[in-house]
């Protein structure tokens, strides 16, 4: 959807869940369609992409100015005296939390509020992230 904020236009695009349907041990089928979503963007205005899981970031083209994601809950289990124990991501701690910049592409991964897969959250305070957009 093309939005206009005081004369500054930008696209807000969203993806379906990448892990929507469980098909067996360690295998999910998603309902995300990155190519189809980006195909609907018809101008050169900046794009903000909303994605539940941050793992899609490796496929996001430079055309997208910012990707916003969650799902990892900041690593979910983080102890100060040990390396990160578990993160619900194919990439481990790489996309667990924060502002990530890779090859000029930007993604913010929120720690969120709950937990994922394992009903436990330690060392990662819940959060709601507010993003202020500017020129």
Which role fits each region the language model picked out?
Residues 1-135:
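Soluble catalytic domains of enzymes that build or remodel membrane lipids, polysaccharides, and related
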